[in-house]
Amino acid sequence: MKRVKRVLALLAAFALVLAMAVPAFADGAEATYTLTINNANGTYEAYQIFSGDLSEKEAGKKVLSNIQWGSGVDATKMGSESAATVAESLTTSALAENFAEDLVSNSKLSSVKATATAKNGTAVFTGLSAGYYLVKNSSIDSGKTYTDFILEVVGNTTANHKGDVPDVEKKVEEKNDSTGATATWGATADYDVGDEINFELMGTLPESYGRYTTYKYKFDDTMTNMTYRNGSVKVYYVKDGSTNRVEISSGFASAWVDGNKKLTVTFDDLKTAVPGLAHGDKIVVTYTATLDANAVVGGNGNPNKVKLEYSNNPNDEGTGETPEKTVVVFTYKTIINKVTKGTDGNNVPLAGAEFTLSKFIASESGSDTVTVNGTEYHGTWNRGVTVTPTNTGNIANVFTFSGLDAGIYRLTETKTPEGYNTIDPVYFEIVATNDGTKVTNMEGKAVNGSEISFTENATNGSLSADVINNAGTTLPSTGGMGTTVFYVVGGGLMAVAVVLLVTKKRMENKR
């Protein structure tokens, strides 16, 4: 009997009892108690597994003796062992959990003693007599897991819902190819249209993972305005506390659907696919996608989401889903207005130009240099892009370069309007910030000694600037000073010749 008492004390510890009090009651009346579940969700059922005689051997310490099967157990299914013998065998938390699962999965429970539904995260049972109870969910809220556990009730008792859910994260790689800065991983990034972008999904196994004999684990990932790069999916596991990734080559299925916009990676049974995993271990999925030409510019960007489907009932085949996690990829645009000075001194549209916008790509072996904020970077300018201008009124002078990453750029006038001087190349940097969901600030900075002023618009992710062409110096035309001088000099020579001719004739006549 002493061993039974020790076991029951151990079960009390398993139950995470946080508070206990015995209310006053009239002589001869059976005492009843409340059981409060914190972090609760859904509806719970309480089954009395063990009953007995409640006594207080020491001040403040209450125990059950004369252990019997409670009203919540079908004693005919419990074999020949007595309740006291079974209770005495439950010497560890693992054995207690296995016992609870055996009762549930093998239909050994009978009458429900009480039910309670969670409200604002708390479920309260009332009118419970002394004993040991198995508490389990009969229903759960969306995104939660079922639980079942055994705990002692010998007074008003408080416990925590012990079911937990796996966690999932999604990250996108951010890199500045104009400066060559070390790439980082986070919730946002900005890229050029056509760039390849690396993504990472990471799911962490829950505390309850060890209670399952099979475990479904499915990543459900949805991209926006991107196209998957064929063959780029890789799957790994990482042990808790380690950074070493071990590639998983079998036991799962990956598929792209909805025009390569949605990725699923499914483990029908993670326990079989990767034996030996435990609470805190991680499953990691990586893949690469390309930013499409129809990507949203500025604003709310291009969100990409992931959720995790997982087994949520160790005694059944049900599944739950985590809330979605989102990362956002941004891209921007630069608008160049070709203008000249009008007679009133104001800028007026000017047609006939052509521009090429090139991006600086950092490289230690690059032969080009650019200076930004006093720092010189080595690299090369890419081939750049040329766009067809749109009109201001009926004048084609607006050049929109869309789908740009943050970085360093060079604007070159590759065709100059007739009668105007070609501008020097203009160097500038695109700088943008966001709050995780939308662009909050845009800035265009002149670099490398250039002069240019931008108007920023974070809502549409644009930087706009006027580029001015000045008329060239006109060469002298017929009737100009050069010709006049020529005429004057020529006329003078003719006059001299006439004078000489007349003088010569007079001299001849005198002879």
Predicted features, each with a name:
Residues 2-511:
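Solvent-exposed loop/turn and edge beta-strand elements of beta-rich ligand-binding domains
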